[in-house]
Design a protein with these regions (language model features):
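Feature captures the catalytic ectodomains and active-site-proximal regions of enzymes
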Residues: 1-150
């Protein structure tokens, strides 16, 4: 947020809002909301993962699914603030995989990254400045915009 790109998008949005307000000859009220908020991720909280081909990392960048040997997982995530959940603990959150497809995608581990942190697996090239998710209290605040032409 507050980047040049962000300001350009806000300007476009404000122009659209004005056009919507001016297009109707009737009194209208418009409400815009999102499913959840957005947080900035500062450089010092971005963690680039270094791991071998013996680990498979997928899923979200803050609730990271991992397949591989536990010792390799612990080594890869040793410097990153968060909590490692093992497969038996995941079943309390995700339920047990009930068919062959779910078993094929069910992870060995899930690493839950602490608030304000994010991980970058090797396969991810995007340089995120923020994160649109729902893990932190800040992200649970739903942005709502209201405007009317009367």
């Amino acid at each position: 947020m507050n980047s040049d790109e962000w300001q350009i998008e806000i300007t476009k949005f404000e122009k659209l809002v004005n056009e919507i307000s001016n297009i109707s000859n009737k009194k209208t009220k418009t409400i815009i909301s999102a499913d959840h908020g957005l947080v900035n991720i500062n450089d010092e909280f971005r963690h680039y993962l270094n791991y071998g081909d013996d680990l498979q990392i997928y899923g979200d960048q803050r609730s990271v699914y991992i397949n591989g040997a536990k010792e390799n997982v612990l080594e890869t995530f040793s410097e990153i603030p968060g909590v490692l959940l093992e497969q038996h603990e995941l079943s309390y959150l995700l339920g047990d995989p009930i068919d062959e497809f779910l078993q094929s995608i069910y992870p060995d581990f899930c690493f839950l990254v602490e608030d304000k942190n994010i991980v970058y697996p090797k396969h991810l090239s995007a340089k995120l400045k923020g994160y649109h998710g729902g893990i932190s209290e800040e992200e649970l605040k739903i942005p709502i915009i209201e405007f009317s032409n009367f």
